[in-house]
From Swiss-Prot:
Protein's cellular compartments: Nucleus
LRR-type repeats, residues: 19-40, 41-62, 63-84, 87-108
Residue span of region Disordered: 228-253
Subunit structure: Associated with the spliceosome.
Domain LRRCT, first and last residues per copy: 121-159
Keyword tRNA-binding in record: no
Acidic residues compositional bias, start-end: 241-253
Function: Involved in pre-mRNA splicing.
Organism, as annotated: Aspergillus fumigatus (strain ATCC MYA-4609 / CBS 101355 / FGSC A1100 / Af293)
MF-aspect GO terms: U2 snRNA binding
Family: Belongs to the U2 small nuclear ribonucleoprotein A family.
An individual GO BP term: mRNA splicing, via spliceosome
GO cellular component: post-mRNA release spliceosomal complex; U2 snRNP
Protein name stated in the entry: U2 small nuclear ribonucleoprotein A'
Amino acid sequence: MRLTVELIQNSLSYINPLKDRELDLRGHKIPTIENLGIAKDQDAIDFTDNDISSLGNFPFFPRLHTLLLARNRVKHIQPTIASTIPNLTTLVLTANNMAELADLDPLRNLTRLTHLVLLENPVTRKEHYRYWVIWRIPSVRFLDYQKVKDAERAKAKELFGTAEEPTALASKIMGIKSRTFDVPSGGAERAPADKAVRVKLTEKERKRVEKMIREARSLQEITRLEKELNEGRIPGGALDAGEDSEDENQMQT
């Protein structure tokens, strides 16, 4: 069922036990977040038990601080999510499809995010999962309902360094993302934010991209490579075309 204006208007909006105004959108098999501009002045939105695959496409909601999305299909988070819901403090993503540690990167810009739940996602089985989230999203104080300890923060820093000088392990993890990238923001009017463009890489191009990320000398260089991929562009040094032209020249000689 689409998240239509009519569905939002007919859904229950109430003051919950925490004295927050909450919009109940549970259990409608909603595939895409859309039309939320009509749902003004909400403190919390409950999307539990739907079919949402991408977390994004929110209007500017400075008041929203709690999102409940357990038992959906979320596998992608819009990189610009922090610009639309900047005051989010609690995000529950239990039983979704987040797969890679680097797929969580957009959450690092939610500087008020203190409570994060990722239980029953494939990403939780990754090595160093908890330390990575603690390092990459330092605002988080409770991860999967467990308080983040100072010793864990120290261990995370030991493993991954700092944002300015990440370790080789951190750089490697930042380069491994699911093969789905955001459509450029310029196309937002033509396509919902949850739709994505897949960058089709040959095996050689994929290996070159991974090598470029491993050999990157700064976080800024890694960010540039990520941006090119997010925009649907293959980084210049990874293109097969140059190699093909060399092969053609050799054949002609």
